């Protein structure tokens, strides 16, 4: 468990440094949130999937 705690602390420190550097470069906290959420999968189907179901292949 101590190993897990150390890894979490290291990751927390790394994220803190990354965010600090981003803020120094003029990147807003909202921009950081948007960027981080780009990789998250939504429960909503994408537009291309919705369209593909409406096309009759025959």
Curated annotation (Swiss-Prot):
What species is this protein from?
Bacillus licheniformis
Q: What is the purpose of this protein?
A: Acts as an antagonist to SinR. SinI prevents SinR from binding to its target sequence on the gene for AprE.
* Protein name in the entry: Protein SinI
Residues covered by the Sin domain: 2-40
Q: How does it assemble?
A: Heterodimer with SinR.
GO terms for biological process?
regulation of DNA-templated transcription
Q: Which InterPro entries match?
A: SinR/SinI_dimer_dom (IPR010981), SinR/SinI_dimer_dom_sf (IPR036281)
Q: Write down the SUPFAM superfamilies for this protein, in alphabetical order.
A: SinR repressor dimerisation domain-like
Annotated coiled-coil segments of the chain: none
Q: A single GO molecular function, which one?
A: protein dimerization activity
């Amino acid at each position: 468990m101590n190993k897990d705690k150390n890894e979490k602390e290291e990751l927390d420190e790394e994220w803190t440094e990354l965010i600090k550097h981003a803020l120094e470069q003029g990147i807003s906290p909202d921009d950081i949130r948007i960027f981080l959420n780009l990789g998250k999968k939504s429960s909503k189907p994408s537009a291309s999937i919705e369209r593909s179901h409406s096309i009759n292949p025959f």
